[in-house]
């Protein structure tokens, strides 16, 4: 009797805890994203959404350390010059390859009005592609928090952005 009751209850509870299948994802956040343009707004909810869609050169780790994301490594060659080596084999949503030109384009776009990121990265004088997988960033002087600032700058496909009037 106990064995039968245990089996019946087990089967009953298995139905209660079965996975639910739905076509809608519900996500709660403290505010609305104002745009899907990663350089248009510098505010929390937009960054939360952008982080789900885009990647940056670097990203904050769980203990707030700076981790590589699209960059596999970086170094400084002078007080005002940073060199980033870009991961190979990264593709955009349309299958095109990520290049250093896309990264330079994104940084330069983010530091140009009407972008809301201008003040965040105002110490950056220029970003340029040295090779397909090497980016150089020149600042207006030593910037010990540049890597932290770059965690908020997301990379777009230059070709896609230009084709779509961004």
Describe the function of each predicted region.
Residues 1-4:
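Positively charged n-region of N-terminal signal peptides that target proteins for export
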Residues 28-78, 108:
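N-terminal lobe/hinge region of extracytoplasmic solute-binding protein
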Residues 58, 62, 79, 91, ...:
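Sec-exported extracytoplasmic/periplasmic mature domains
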